[in-house]
Amino acid sequence: MTSSKPKKSSRVRKTSKNSKKNNKIIMPTLAKTPPSFKNKVVDKKALKNLVSWAYKTHGTAVTAAMADNLKDLGFKYATQAAVSISVEDLKVPEAKQDLIGQAEAQITSTEECYRLGEITEVERHTKVIDTWTETNERLVDAVKNNFNQNDPLNSVWMMANSGARGNMSQVRQLVGMRGLMANPQGEIIDLPIRTNFREGLTVTEYVISSYGARKGLVDTALRTADSGYLTRRLVDVAQDVIVREEDCGTERSIVIEAEDGKFGSRLIGRLSAEDVLDSEDNLIIPKNTAIDPSLSKTIETSLISTVNIRSPLTCEANRSVCRKCYGWALAHNHLVDLGEAVGIIAAQSIGEPGTQLTMRTFHTGGVSTAESGVVRSKIKGKVEFSSKAKIRGYRTPHGVEAKQAEVDFLLKIIPSGNNSNKAQKIEVTSGSLLFVDDGQEIDSDITVAQITSGAVKKSVEKATKDVICDLAGQVRYDKVLQPKEVTDRQGNITLKAQRLGRLWVLAGDVYNLPPNAKPVISTEKNVEQGTVLAEASQYSEFGGEVRLRESVGDSREVQIVTTSMLLSNFNLIEESTHSGEIFHLESNDGTIYRLNTSPGSKISSGEVIADLADERFRTKTGGLVKYAPGLSVKKARSSKNGFEVSQGGTLLWIPQETHEINKDISLLMTEDMAWIEAGTEVVKDIFSQTSGIVTVTQKNDILREITVRNGSFHECEDEEVLNRFTEEGQLVNPGEKIIDGVDNNEILFVQKLETSKSKGLLLRTVEEFNIPDEAELPELTHVKQEKGPSLGLKAIQRLSYKDGELIKSVEGVELLKTHLSLESFDATPQMTIDVETIKDKSNDSINRLNLVILESILVRRDTISDSSHGSTHTELQVKNNQQVKAGDVIATTQILCKEKGIVQLPDLVENEPIRRLIVEREEDKIKINITGKALVKVGDRVVDGDSISEGEKATSCGEIEEVSSKCVTLRLGRPYMVSPDSVLHVKDGDLVLRGDGLALLVFERQKTGDIVQGLPRIEELLEARRPRDSSTLCKRSGVVQIKEGNDDESVSLSVIERDDSINEYQLLIGQNIMVSDGQQVKGGELLTDGPINPHELLDCLFTDIKDQKPLMDAARESISKLQRRMVNEVQNVYKSQGVAIDDKHIEVIVRQMTSKVRIEDAGDTTLLPGELIELRQVEDTNQAMSITGGAPAEFTPVLLGITKASLNTDSFISAASFQETTRVLTEAAIEGKSDWLRGLKENVIIGRLIPAGTGFSGFVEELASEAGPHPDILAEESGGYRRAQNLRPDYTVDMPQSPTVSSTAILDDPSDEDLETTRNRHGIDPSSSNFAAFARPNAENQFSEDQLPDPAALEGLQEEGLLSDE
C-alpha cells in the first residue's frame, strides 16, 4: 500500500528559505577564517568576546565544547592555587598621605579665603567638595599604579582588574579612601572619610559612612519592586507585537549619526534602508542588507557620518513588525524569524536591567562642574585678544574672578623677546571663561582659559544656604552691598543685597536684656566691671500681704495674699484611719462636713471642698427612685456628681434588695415568687435583709440575680383590673381604688405579676424624702474686696440618681448629697486658691480652715555671667508680712557689666524696647605700631595682609578706630562675603550673638546634579509624565524678540512668525531664557530652561510642520522626531549607569506609545471626534474619502504613556487583565466590542495556542496555495488567524495507519528541501533514522509491546525512506 504524498504542508515557512539564503552568504566565509592566536591576558571582557566570537563563527556545538574546556581549565588552576584575600593583600599606596596632605593644604587656603571674606560660604563648600572629589580620583590612580608596578599578582587587584569580583570603586574604599558621603537629605557632607576599611574608620566617620549604607539597602528593596512593576507594564503594552510579515515594503527609515566618527554597535543587526555609497560613489552596502560588525567597520573607515536604516519605528506592517524592519534577533544574530514575539523580548530587555539602575541621585549642593577644556599657555609671552572680542566679568563657582566671552573669537599668545617660538592660538567659544587680560604678560604653563563646548546655557535652579555668625558683635554693611527692601506678593518686606559685597561683624560683648529691663546708662560711656547696665523690676498686680518663702532651685518665691477667708464658725477635726488622714469640719450647731481636700493643697474655683455628712437621705437597701411632681433638677448631669436640684420637693423611694449571684442553680434555697422573712437564707451563705417577695432571674441553669421586693401580693383574675397596671409598675395615690378588699391610705407602688401558678398585683410601700429648695449654709461664707478677686462658698444639693432609675444593691445608698463649693470672682486663671489651717486666736486647741488667693512672684536669683548674659543681682524691696498696694515694686534685678569697656546702645526704633546692648572691651581691639606714614583712615575696614602703613601689614581683619603717628588701633571683626540677591537677616548696626543667622545666600546651581535619574526617570519617560515647571517651547518657527520690562525682573519674550504675526510667551518667575534676541527658532525648540513636556513638544512640532506640509506627513514627521528623542532619552539613562540595551527594543515600545492619533473633526468619515485610533487606520479611511470625494478626518497625533497605551489596546481582554478591569469590561460590553485575539495575552487568557512561535499561522495567500487536502484550515479567516474551531496546533501528515497509532509530524513533508538541509545540518542519515526522530510522542503514539503498528503501515514508511529495514 503506498502512502499518498501530501503536497507541501501549511506549516512551511516560506520565508525561512530566504533567511537561510541571506545567512548562507556569510556563514561559510566566516567558518573558513583561519584560527588566530591571541597573546594577551584574558579577563572577563575578553572571555565574553571570545565566547561570542566562537558562537558567531562556529555555531553552538563548537562554542559549547569550548566553554566546557574553558571551565575545565579554570577548575584545574583553581585546585592548584586559590585566589583568596587576606588582610595582607590590602596594600595602601604610599602616595596617599601626600595626596591627602595636598588636599588639606588646598582646603586650608580655601578656608583662609573664606575667613578673609573673599569667597562666600557656597563657594567655599563647592571648592572643598571639588578638592576632595579630585583627590579621590587621583588616589584611585595611585592605587592602580601601586598594584600594577609593585604587586601585579595581588589577589585583590587580580579580582578587581579581571572583572571576576568587585570593581575599582570598591577597591578604592578598601585601600584608598572611602571619600565623600551624602547626608539623609542627599546633600554631600563636606567632611570626607579620609581613612579606608584597611586602616579603619574613626567613630565620626563610621556614623557618616552608615548614612550611605542604610540608604543603599532601602534603595535596593524599593528598586526590585519598582522594576518588576515597570516590566509588567512594558509587557502589557508590547505583548501583541509579533513579527508577522516578511517585508512591509516601506520607503521610510531613520537616520543613525556617527558619534566621533564611530557607530559602535548601533548599526549591527539592522538592515540598510538605501544603498550606502562611499565618498567616491562606490557601493559599499546594497539596500536591505543586514549590517554585521565587519560591514559597520567598513562604513566607519569610509568616513560615512550618517546611515539610513530600517527600524520598527517606521515599519508599515499592520499591527506588527516585519522581519526587514526589525533586523537581527539578537539571540542568534540572524534575521528574526516569523512569529517571534519581539514585543515581549523588548519589554524584558528594558525592564530587567531596571534593578541595576539607581533610584535617586544625590543633591550635590551645586557640586563639581568638571573643569572642561582647560587650556594652559605653552609659551611665555603677551596675551592678545582679537578685535571682535566681547567679554564681561564673571565669578566662577569657586569664587575666582574671571571673564566670560560673549562671542567666539581668537586669542593669541605672542612670544616675548626674540623668541623663535610660534604664537599660540586659542579658539575661544562664546561662554568660555578667561583667566587673563588683554595685553597681559604671562609665563608658560599658566591657566589661560576654560573653553566650553556645546550648549553654553546649562539649565540652572535657585538654591539657598544660610550664613551663620561666628562671633558676637555689631553688624556693619559694606557700601557696595546697596541693600534694598523688596516686597513680595504677600506683602512681606525682605532686605536684599544688590551687589557682591561684605557684611562685617565687629567684635564686642553683647548682652541679652531680660524682657522688662531698661538700660540705665548712656551710649559711648566707659564702664568698669560690676557697673549696672540695665534694671528690671517686678510688680504686684493686686497688692496684699507679703509672705516670703524659702528659695526653691534658682529662684525665690514671693507670695502676696490678695484675698483670704477664714471659716471661723467651723472647727477643723482630724481623724486618722488606716488609709490616711481624714478631715472634718464641724459647725457650731453640730453639722459635720467631710473635707474633700487637705490643708496645704491648691484648688481652683468651682471645686467642691466639702460634703455634708447627712444620714437623713440614706436608705437601707437598693431600690427605685421616683421624683414626685414639683421636684425638678437641672437637665445636664454635672459630671459624675449627680443632678443639681433646681427646685425642692418630694423624692419617692421604693426599696428593693438585689443580690447578684452568678452561680449554679442548684444552690438556690428558695422558690420564685415565694414570700420570705428578713434573715432567710436565699442562696447558700447569702441572707435576705428585708421581708418580701422573691424573684429569681436565671439563664442556662446559671442563677443570675435574686430580687426581694417588699409589699404584699394579691391574687386577681379580673383582666380589666390587671390591665390597668404594668409589670414596670406605677404609683397610686391614697384613696384610689386598686382591688376589692384593699384600702389604701398611703401612696403605693403597684406592679402586675404573672407567674405560671397565679396572676395578681404586688402592692409595695413607698418611702418619702423631703428636699428643701435651698441647702442650709453656715454663716460667713463670702469675702468681697474693692480691688482684686473675691471668694465665696456656695451650697449645692445634688441628687445621685435620675427619675425612674433602679439601683441594684444590697447596701443602702445616699440619695441626696449637699456639697460646699468654692467660688472666686475676678480671679485670673493662673491664680490658685490655697487651703491652710490656722490656730484659733482665743483657743490654741481649736484649728480653723483658712482659704487664701495668692499672687506668686518668682524673683530671680543672682546669676554669674555667661556668654550672652551679664551677671545679675536681685534685691527684694519688701519685707515679710508687709502690706503692699497694687503696682508696687516687689524686686529689682540689675544686669552688671562683666568687663570694663565702652557701652554702645543700638539705634532706637519707635515703640520697640532695647533687647541687646554691646560693650566694646580692650580685648576686642589691637594696636599696631607703625613707623612710616599711615595709609588708612578711621572707619576703613581692612583684612589680614592689607597694608596699613608703608612698612606694616594688618595682622587681623577689622575696622580702623584711631590713627596716630605711632600706631593704629584696629577693632577686630569678621567679614562675610554675600552674593547679589541674598536675603539679609540683619540690618546695619544690629547686634548679633554667635550662631545667629546673618543672611541667606541665593545661588544658582546646575540642575544636572540632581535631575531625576535611574528608574524614576525611565518611568517618567515611558509613562510620558508632564514634568513640573516645564520649559516653554516655541510653537511655530520664527525670529525671537526679547524686550526688557520696566523693572529689572520682568522680561517679555515673543516670536515673530512666518506670517508676521507675533506670538508672546508668558514666562514664569525664575525661568532662564535659552535664546538670544534676533535668533531664528523652529517649532518645538526650547525658549526657556527646564524639563521638556513631551506632549507639548509633539504638539508644537505638529503645529509647526502642518503649516508647510500635508496633515499626514506632518503627523508622521512630528511623531518621528518625538520618537527619536524618546529613544535617546531612555538610552541616556541606561548608558549613564553602564547598561547596554539595543535601540530596537526601546523603539518597539516607543512605537506602541506613539501609534495613535486623536480625531478632531470627523469630516464625512464614520469616526467620532475625540476617538483615539491608529494612524494607519485614519490614513486608509482618508484615502477612501479622497476617492469618493468626501471630507477627510482631521486629527492630531498623541503620545500615550505605557499604562494608557495598554488600556487603549484593541483587545479588551488584554486591557481588562491589566488594570481597571470593571471599567474596561463595562465599556466593552456597552460598545458591543469583539476581541480578535491577535495578541499573546488574550489567547493565553482564554486558553488557546498563542499566535507566536509554532502557533504562528503565516499568510493567508500562502496557506491558500498550499492547503492541499485540508482547505478547511481557511474556512473562516479573520486577520490572518484561524478561528478557534479550525485551529490545529500542527499540520498532520496523512498516513495509512492502524487506529491505535497516530503521529504528529514536527517537520513537514519529507520532500521538503528544508528537511534536507535540516538533516544535513544535524548530520542525520535518513536511511538510519528512526520514525521517532520525526514524530512528536503523544499519548497515543507511545508504542507498547502488544501494540506494534500494522506491517502495511511500516512498509509504507520504509518506502518513504523514513524507516530503515530494522
UniProtKB/Swiss-Prot annotation:
Source organism phylogeny: Bacteria, Bacillati, Cyanobacteriota, Cyanophyceae, Synechococcales
What organism is this sequence from? Prochlorococcus marinus (strain MIT 9515)
Name of the protein in its database record:
DNA-directed RNA polymerase subunit beta'
Q: Which Pfam families match?
A: RNA_pol_Rpb1_3 (PF04983), RNA_pol_Rpb1_4 (PF05000), RNA_pol_Rpb1_5 (PF04998)
Alphabetical UniProt keywords: DNA-directed RNA polymerase, Metal-binding, Nucleotidyltransferase, Transcription, Transferase, Zinc
Question: Region (Disordered) spans which residues?
Answer: 1-25, 1290-1366
Q: Which GO terms describe its molecular function?
A: DNA binding; DNA-directed RNA polymerase activity; zinc ion binding
Q: Which residues form a coiled coil?
A: none
CC annotations in GO: DNA-directed RNA polymerase complex
EC number, as in UniProt: 2.7.7.6
How is the cofactor bound here?
Binds 1 Zn(2+) ion per subunit.
**Oligomer and partners:** In cyanobacteria the RNAP catalytic core is composed of 2 alpha, 1 beta, 1 beta', 1 gamma and 1 omega subunit. When a sigma factor is associated with the core the holoenzyme is formed, which can initiate transcription.
List the CDD domains hit by this protein, alphabetically: RNAP_beta'_C (cd02655)
